[in-house]
Amino acid sequence: MLLWAAVGCLVSTAGYAQKIKGSDTCLPLTQQEAENYMARHPESRVTVTGGGSGVGISALQEGTTDIAMASRKIKFDERAKLVEKGKKPKEVVIAYDALAVVLHPSNPVTALTREQLEGIFTGKITNWKEVGGANLKIVAYSRETSSGTYEFFKESVLKNKNYKSGILSMPATGAIIQSVSQTPGAIGYVGLAYLNRDVKAAHVSYDGGRRYVEPSLAHAKDKTYPIVRPLFYYYEAANEAKVKPFIDYILSDEGQATVKKTGYIPVR
């Protein structure tokens, strides 16, 4: 999966070769949608690669991708740079995603409040015994600064406080899963679609511990799980005729069924 994501997934849109780049959160979904789309339009080809939301938007600015995948909204300066280059960026929400907090399976801690998560990732809480766990050093994993997931977690969970100095930054979501699964004191955060049996997802409370909610598609859809965000595609308006068939497919009933099947929340 990680190697495939790194080198790109060559699949094929109607009659066009297309490049899609950016968010690792969007990557598994876009790969699957592209495979399904190619099956319907074998004359087309789409190349899908990850790297992070910032990487995708930078590629859109430089004209090296047709669609930028992002797990956050485009920033003012990113939009301004596109406009400076004579490009008019357009935005579409293709799905929603929940962020799960993941722990090593051996960790006796099963639930954390937002305030505890803030303390852990800002460095104020350094040992699991401080949140009801064993006397074990906390090893916190994060995404890199170019990641939209990094920025969304900072905004939603840390309330825009800075991550602690020396936090272990991973280049891709899969690397967080792998690292947490191999480190008893570890904690990290990943998109819901990346959850597997190698890690344990913590229940999360945003009301001071009165109610803890398990990260799941059902809880994300009914809005009882608090860490949910939209997933975006950005493209240049002048390129709309080229990218619209693929985007329309993702927003169709068939495409949205794939959204749900792949572990994301449909837009409707």
Please place each PLM-identified region on the residue numbering.
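Exported/periplasmic ABC-transporter solute-binding proteins
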Residues: 16-268
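Bacterial N-terminal signal peptides
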Residues: 1-12
